[in-house]
């Protein structure tokens, strides 16, 4: 049963880059139906373990004209795709690992592509396609010889009785100086813990060729058309995803630019309104300046005229009310303030002992009565003139 994208997200819930990892895994499963995602415990060299997702199953490899299913297991670290997957060949009981420059005795796979792994240039689908090409040139497993057979055992790595690459010590690859000891943040990567591999009978490798009944060719080479087709497929898939990512990025940038353009248009409209308002205010200010200049000239002329006439003018004649009622109010106000000053100075005279208390009280009583009458009359006159109350 195929695993859905939601199930993958649940399995990879602890992955740092879950959505990206799920997307690449879905692409691989869609192209290679035999690979199934499994959540299992991976044991590192230091004995620590971690729950990781692995892709377990077979990939089709064309060797000498026939297609064989090579069992593999790809462990995806929780920092994928910034760390490469840990890849193993998973031979069945009827198979034997053929050690070489790409596979060690434990079945661990070493490839230049894994060594040079760098996101976003490297991805899982392209890795599998490169494995198919390399395993087509140098198969990582071959079938065990059977004692009861009356014919020489057939091997997937070459003709019968041909010499195989000598077994390499466990953990040693053909790239001694290039591969990092282990992915960043993880201990070493040994062979995964032993566990049952999905049922695969001995007849699956070498499998019955699904596309031809002819026996494998004996020339020991893989056709250039096959390599070219695999590389073209890998490159086209990668270009397709790169183009999609670029298109998505360009669309997001275009949307952001559109929003910025709208904001700029709104800002431009506000600035135009502000400039129009400022122009109106400047025109109003210029008008007020002209008016003030005229008034200033009038005041200067009046002051100059008054200075020339000040020597011949009496101060009492200068202040002349425009109506008799206003003149009466002015006289009443002046007289009332004079009485106020008189009462003040009488108090000062009493304090200094110039006059007696009886004299002070007598004059104050008379002045206060007079002041009251003046205030009452002035209040009535102001009311008649339409002025506000003074007291």
From Swiss-Prot:
Highest taxon of source: Eukaryota
Compositionally biased intervals (Polar residues): 200-215
Motif PTAP motif mapped to chain: 321-324
Keyword Nucleotide-binding found: no
Membrane topology recorded in Swiss-Prot or TrEMBL: Peripheral membrane protein
Membrane found in the keyword field: yes
Subcellular location: Cytoplasm; Early endosome membrane; Late endosome membrane; Cytoplasm, Cytoskeleton, Microtubule organizing center, Centrosome
Gene Ontology MF terms: calcium-dependent protein binding; protein homodimerization activity; protein-containing complex binding; transcription corepressor activity; ubiquitin binding; ubiquitin protein ligase binding; virion binding
Homology family: Belongs to the ubiquitin-conjugating enzyme family. UEV subfamily.
Functional description taken from the UniProt entry: Component of the ESCRT-I complex, a regulator of vesicular trafficking process. Binds to ubiquitinated cargo proteins and is required for the sorting of endocytic ubiquitinated cargos into multivesicular bodies (MVBs). Mediates the association between the ESCRT-0 and ESCRT-I complex. Required for completion of cytokinesis; the function requires CEP55. May be involved in cell growth and differentiation. Acts as a negative growth regulator. Required for the exosomal release of SDCBP, CD63 and syndecan.
Protein name per its UniProtKB record: Tumor susceptibility gene 101 protein
